A protein has these predicted regions:
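Sec-dependent signal peptide recognition
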Residues: 2-9
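C-terminal motif of bacterial Sec signal peptides marking the signal peptidase cleavage site
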Residues: 13-16
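Residue-level signal for mature regions of secreted extracellular proteins and peptides
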Residues: 10-11, 25
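Catalytic glycan-binding domains that act on GlcNAc-containing polysaccharides
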Residues: 20-192
Length: 192
């Protein structure tokens, strides 16, 4: 076989092996399954809960909604004339889908200059930091997944203005985040 063909076959075999922790776990509707597949995630969520007070289930429901537990998640491309790529819809990236500017604020505020959005520990810590600020600025309880998600999506000022009230789709999504947090919480109570 030619050297080029061997390299191509090897590359194909390696690419089919999977993507480690940046690929999502299987069965995202089962918190216990996620915990078994990704014990590193659970350690990160518990560390965030200890530091910031945000319940594990609220963090998990937020990450599910934002990235489906994909560490390399990005927003879709925008297209001109339906075919010419014009860049991404926003700078959101990683598990938490944090925007560049908000991520920079987090790194400055926490002193975590090397924090990365595709690292589950950093992403969950970011969520804890952001939701704690939502509690402080907007009076949202840390276990209120619905309103925490609305503030997470709209920003603290947007939440304070009630910008989400004119977005029926977002209100529906926030209800889904709340339902998923309740589901995850009940599952985690059974599996420890």
């Amino acid at each position: 076989m030619s050297r080029t063909l061997c390299v191509m076959i090897l590359a194909l075999m390696l690419s089919s092996c999977g993507g480690g922790y940046k690929s999502p776990p299987h069965d995202l509707d089962n918190a216990c399954s996620i915990a078994v597949q990704r014990p590193k995630y659970v350690r990160a969520f518990k560390a965030t809960e200890r530091r910031w007070g945000v319940p594990v289930a609220v963090q998990m429901a937020t990450i599910y909604q934002e990235s489906r537990f994909r560490g390399d998640a990005r927003t879709p491309f925008r297209y001109a004339l339906g075919i010419i790529p014009m860049g991404r819809q926003s700078s959101a990236f990683g598990y938490s889908q944090a925007l560049d500017g908000t991520w920079d604020d987090y790194r400055r505020a926490t002193g975590k200059r090397r924090a990365k959005r595709d690292n589950i520990r950093d992403a969950s810590d970011f969520i804890g930091w952001y939701m704690t600020r939502s509690r402080d600025k907007n009076g949202i309880a840390l276990n209120d997944a619905r309103n925490q998600y609305l503030a997470y999506h709209e920003g603290h000022s947007g939440y304070a203005r009630g910008s989400y009230n004119s977005k029926s789709w977002l209100l529906r999504v926030a209800d889904e985040v709340e339902a998923r947090a309740v589901l995850y919480n009940s599952q985690l109570a059974r599996c420890g």
